């Protein structure tokens, strides 16, 4: 049986069925053609990114498949989707096993009207360009300061590197992070009692720490992408710039393997 889940809730758990499968297109490259005065032919500007993908799923609910009445079903689905407007949430389906993406529901008002009258609806979504593998969403951790990863996908990945200091020093000190023998940051990165845990987020393009759930920007140091499968491996090396014990560092890399 074909189904999908949105923000962790499966359509089938509500007695729903897909009546028309989504047509999943591959994200297109964000490219512009610009006319230059006096020049024959347009210039092509590659914005180095991909566009969102719009898709729809037609669903129906069968009352004999559940103990709920038709009105209860409509109410349950509306209660499920109503809080999920205006932001991205995790979307999975049975056409892409082992992968997830981030999608936004774009037509809640239409869905609300259709469900209350027909117990059918067409859900329209806008998703981010990539599908992310479940395995790539798992952090790989080391306490010896060294990790080597090889990307299994055909597209470069944007990793999140988390560095945690578990020692007893109460003042910040510095460490160096090397990726494929290239140093990130000339003066090292501060860590210690004041900033015991921090993130270098390749996807969000941010280097930050968390304080009361809020991101606090630390620097412009970012991890490079993990090359695609045909390229070389990705070696991360963490080294304290002082006599602090290297075993007091924990480094983890969430690789975020992805495909279009």
Regions found by a protein language model. Give the residues of each.
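Hydrophobic residues positioned within well-ordered beta-strands of beta-sheet architectures
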Residues: 55-57, 101, 121-123, 159, ...
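Short beta-strand and beta-hairpin "edge-sheet" elements
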Residues: 88-132
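Intrinsically disordered, low-complexity segments enriched in serine, threonine, and glycine
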Residues: 133-260
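Short N-terminal edge-element motif at the start of the domain
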Residues: 66-103
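Beta-strand elements of well-folded, non-transmembrane domains
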Residues: 59-63, 107-109, 127-131, 165-167, ...
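Solvent-exposed edge beta-strands and adjacent loop segments
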Residues: 1-54, 97-110
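Solvent-exposed loop and beta-edge segments used for protein-protein assembly and interaction
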Residues: 49-53, 83, 115-119, 153-157, ...
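Oligomerization/assembly interface segments of phage tail-like spikes and tubes
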Residues: 34, 42-69, 117-130
